[in-house]
Amino acid sequence: MVKRYGELYLEARRALRASEGENASFVARELLGFASGKSAAALMADRELYASEQTAERMEQYTARALQGEPLAYILGKWSFYGLELTVTPDVLIPRDDTMAVTELAIGKLREMEAPQRVLDLCTGSGCIGLAIAHQIETARVTLADLSQPALRIARKNIADLKMIGRVNALQADVREPAPKFWGQFDLIVSNPPYVTAQEMTELDVSVRAHEPEMALDGGEDGLDFYRAILQNFTPALRTGGWICFEFGFR
């Protein structure tokens, strides 16, 4: 049955209300935009027009995925962070607004340093922190590092998509191992490491537990395993007067 854009939106919003609450309108609008290839403004203008069968089928599929708990960012394959549109997949954590705090802290510290500022983003995932830094501070030279090769593929795609090749690079590194090749190279290290405790891992919302990468969440028994490892193994990577900036959880 052929339906209008407005009908597709309202049906999805109703279906999503129980799981998404007040966010149902936003999710339904984003899904319809993705299914149709139209902007929010175009959908509003075209709400009385009939959508194609292909658009209606895609909308049904995307809504079903959302109802099963799949995060919106993974359905869309992209997410916005610090004004940048980033590719995201289940290989990386979804960038969250909370992470803007450590990003802003790092940017503030780097503005006080002489150019070119050398930055290492550990446990980088999608690269969101390091890429935001590079976007805000053009003189910064940023290295994105992660143990996960699938995550590094996403980070490298984001580097290329944002046209930051030459200022940002990505490489594999295990923060649990000493890294003498990095010693004395960086003015600032920034990291949003895994910090969920063993107990909290069992209590995570299904949308996180079933879809986001466990290795990017699990911080060990007390949630501090990666902080200890980074401080032990990567403090020597700092130049004199350098900084380490961490995101951490509250409990």
Residue ranges, per PLM feature:
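Mobile active-site "lid"/loop adjacent to the S-adenosyl-L-methionine
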Residues: 195-226
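Conserved Class I SAM-dependent methyltransferase catalytic core
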Residues: 221-251
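Non-catalytic accessory regions of SAM-dependent methyltransferases
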Residues: 1-43, 48-51
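Residue-level signal for inorganic ion chemistry
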Residues: 31, 69, 99, 129, ...
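Active-site beta-alpha loop architecture of Rossmann-like, nucleotide-cofactor-dependent enzymes
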Residues: 73, 196-199, 251
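Class I S-adenosylmethionine-dependent transferase superfamily signal
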Residues: 106, 133, 208, 230-234
